[in-house]
């Protein structure tokens, strides 16, 4: 069955109201996207992430009375009588299949591949992590995850103990084990992330080598390698905690950092680490070093 999409450009402060109006007027789904390719900075706790110029899209069945929807929405104070909008007809497709077709195995560095479960492994002799793309946690498609994966691929990890702060999907910890680490301790504030990490570790047959904790239960230990792909704010706030996990001579990698934030994070951690050159990928950055 074909669909019609009603697209409305609005300001961030009105976006949720517009989305609610679309839902109240029969939209089967409502999506928020960036209208002007604007970088997204860190939200405050509990804040919804919306762009200054936000495009709100409502999806309707093709035979829905769209003239009626537009007429009703034009009476709202938020939009007004002649609010700018666009109607697009979408052809009927197997959207799930099309989504799956867009994802292919990805190579990071010399040895490491991240492969969706429905794709053949390109190189059976390589280090292959099986991980399906998702929305909530990392799968290698974001530059910050890619920066960390390339860093791990270049590291000698045999028999190393690794700590992964903000483990999310477990992708970095699983990659570390596949690259030779003997044990990974993953820490995340979200119980769902810990479940995702364990599920993905089990899928890669290394579930017995990863330990997962909420912050209030995290163990005290000294690791050979510490990973933290989170955000600049938590990296600042948790500097002492993250640093304490890294033994003398141990390695540290930090990401989730915008390029303009990288030097500040680098300087902060240089108190305890010999810092390496900052690596930039588009708008994002990686900071790394060796514990003094």
From Swiss-Prot:
Binding site for S-adenosyl-L-methionine: 145, 166, 188, 229
Cellular component annotations (GO), alphabetically ordered: cytosol
Pfam family, one: PrmA
GO biological process: methylation
Enzymatic reactions: L-lysyl-[protein] + 3 S-adenosyl-L-methionine = N(6),N(6),N(6)-trimethyl-L-lysyl-[protein] + 3 S-adenosyl-L-homocysteine + 3 H(+)
Keywords, alphabetical: Cytoplasm, Methyltransferase, S-adenosyl-L-methionine, Transferase
GO molecular function: protein-lysine N-methyltransferase activity
Transmembrane intervals: none
Enzyme Commission number(s) of this protein: 2.1.1.-
Subcellular localization(s) per the UniProt record: Cytoplasm
InterPro entries referenced in this protein's UniProt entry, alphabetically: Ribosomal_L11_MeTrfase_PrmA, Ribosomal_PrmA_MeTrfase, SAM-dependent_MTases_sf
Function: Methylates ribosomal protein L11.
NCBIfam families: prmA (TIGR00406)
Family: Belongs to the methyltransferase superfamily. PrmA family.
PANTHER family, per the entry: ELECTRON TRANSFER FLAVOPROTEIN BETA SUBUNIT LYSINE METHYLTRANSFERASE
HAMAP family (UniProt xref): Methyltr_PrmA
Protein name per UniProt: Ribosomal protein L11 methyltransferase
UniProt organism field: Pseudoalteromonas atlantica (strain T6c / ATCC BAA-1087)
Origin organism lineage: Bacteria, Pseudomonadati, Pseudomonadota, Gammaproteobacteria, Alteromonadales
């Amino acid at each position: 069955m074909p669909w019609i999409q009603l697209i409305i450009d609005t300001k961030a402060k009105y976006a949720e109201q517009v989305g609610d109006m679309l839902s109240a007027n029969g939209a089967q789904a409502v999506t928020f996207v960036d209208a002007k390719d604007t970088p997204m900075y860190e939200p405050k706790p509990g804040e919804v992430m919306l762009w200054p110029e936000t495009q709100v899209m409502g999806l309707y069945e093709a035979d829905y009375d769209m003239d009626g929807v537009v007429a009703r929405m034009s009476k709202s104070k938020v939009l007004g009588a002649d609010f700018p909008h666009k109607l697009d007809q979408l052809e009927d497709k197997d959207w799930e299949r099309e989504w799956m077709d867009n994802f292919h195995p990805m190579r990071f560095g010399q040895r490491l591949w991240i492969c969706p479960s429905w794709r053949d492994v390109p190189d059976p002799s390589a280090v292959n992590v099986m991980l399906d793309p998702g929305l909530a946690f990392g799968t290698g498609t974001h530059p910050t995850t890619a920066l960390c994966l390339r860093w791990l691929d270049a590291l000698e990890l045999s028999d190393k103990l690794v700590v992964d702060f903000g483990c999310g999907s477990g992708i970095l910890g699983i990659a570390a084990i596949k690259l030779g680490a003997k044990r990974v301790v993953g820490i995340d504030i979200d119980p769902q992330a810990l479940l995702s990490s364990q599920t993905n570790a089990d899928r890669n047959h290394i579930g017995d080598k990863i330990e997962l904790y909420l912050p209030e239960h995290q163990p005290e230990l000294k690791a050979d390698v510490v990973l933290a792909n989170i955000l600049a704010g938590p990296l600042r706030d948790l500097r002492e905690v993250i640093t304490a996990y890294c033994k003398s001579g141990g390695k540290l990698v930090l990401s989730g950092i915008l390029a303009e934030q990288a030097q500040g994070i680098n300087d902060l951690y240089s108190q305890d680490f010999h810092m390496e050159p900052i690596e930039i990928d588009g708008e994002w950055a990686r900071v790394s070093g060796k514990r003094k």
